[in-house]
């Protein structure tokens, strides 16, 4: 059905023509976060990857100055977005097993995990944009660590 409707072509054309190339991997990441959270599964990677790769290729074709790092950053956005949703969703097997193992309610466990996961997801968006702009992996990881450390120092509490 998706093939006959041309959903992939529609999404590729929509994102490749309307979004600034600097934000495409971050958009892919956020979309994957939403899909995996709603589905409660890593399966979103299989749903989004067939769209993310053509989107990345179309954007690279439309913007000749983009480096070869662009496609791997888009793929990383899909993978990390899928992991985010699988970690946060109250419907995923990981959350259910962790709640059962700790003896707490599944929703209570999911709600306690969300502030941490959303914080890291927001930092990840900055790091994805940094990687999209061509900064090295070492710089991008250091940026993420420094931002997370600053958040801990500013908002963290001593037990």
Map each language-model feature to its residues.
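Loop-to-transmembrane alpha-helix initiation sites
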Residues: 69-73, 136-144
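Interfacial segments of transmembrane alpha-helices in multi-pass membrane proteins
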Residues: 37-45, 131-140
